């Protein structure tokens, strides 16, 4: 039965919540030292056993994959925090006061968290729709890749009415091809074209359909990795 002024206990609970909020990321998932994880099959989700004083155990269900270690818990603790003073509407949890210990296999004990009163102001996130986008990825093969990329790009935008009608155009040529390829896969470069607009029709199915129409009407040896697709919001 904590009061709103039991800041140390609240800070410990906040730390526990932060550790388990991303699920398996605290039990070995997305962990830089992934070779330490015995298995990723049936990875267990984290469990927080919180004590009256605000200390807690992080563990997982037995006979599940993954790993609960000082490393996995610390990695998640540092995830998306910005400052060691982790701000919450109820308390500020000072993560630099925490003590993290391996209690047993897949059991980590976290204690010592100090808390302070919450701030008067809070951060608010507002997400705005940017518009609509469509894109395609083309595989270019053979010689003269740079010239081929320039040719197909110019042809695509000429057929849809020009680049200037879009709010933004992003063109990227990735030279994954090798100079002396030993297979078809080694001979391929990737050309990525993305277009964005407030008008969904401008970047809709017509845009991708125009690219498909060029399959037999441009240079030889290229193909697309996507068909005719509608636009999507961003």
Tell me what each language-model feature is.
Residues 2-10:
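Conserved phosphate- and dinucleotide-binding cores of soluble alpha/beta proteins
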Residues 3, 39, 88, 144, ...:
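Serine/threonine-rich low-complexity intrinsically disordered regions
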Residues 5, 63, 110, 124, ...:
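Residue-level detector of functional hotspots within protein domains
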Residues 10-117, 133, 137:
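A conserved active-site cap/scaffold subdomain adjacent to cofactor or substrate pockets
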Residues 120-234:
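C-terminal non-catalytic interaction/assembly regions of soluble proteins
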């Amino acid at each position: 039965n904590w009061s709103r002024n039991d800041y140390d206990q609240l800070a410990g609970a906040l730390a526990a919540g932060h550790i388990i909020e991303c699920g398996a990321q605290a039990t070995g998932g997305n962990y830089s030292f992934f070779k330490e994880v015995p298995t990723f099959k049936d990875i267990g989700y984290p469990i927080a056993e919180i004590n009256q004083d605000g200390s807690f155990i992080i563990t997982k269900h037995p006979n599940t994959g993954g790993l609960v270690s000082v490393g996995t818990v610390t990695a998640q603790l540092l995830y998306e925090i910005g400052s060691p003073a982790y701000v919450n509407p109820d308390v500020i949890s000072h993560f630099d006061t925490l003590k993290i210990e391996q209690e047993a296999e897949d059991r980590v004990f976290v204690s010592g968290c100090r808390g302070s009163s919450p701030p008067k102001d809070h951060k608010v996130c507002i997400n705005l729709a940017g518009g609509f986008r469509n894109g395609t990825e083309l595989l270019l093969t053979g010689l003269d890749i740079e010239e081929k990329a320039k040719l197909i790009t110019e042809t695509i935008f000429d057929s849809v009415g020009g680049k200037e009608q879009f709010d933004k155009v992003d063109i990227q040529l990735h030279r994954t091809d090798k100079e002396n390829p030993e297979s078809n896969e080694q001979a391929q470069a990737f050309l990525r074209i993305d277009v964005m607009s407030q008008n969904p029709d401008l970047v809709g199915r017509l845009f991708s359909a125009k690219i498909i129409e060029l399959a037999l009407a441009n240079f030889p040896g290229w193909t697309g990795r996507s068909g005719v697709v509608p636009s999507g919001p961003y």
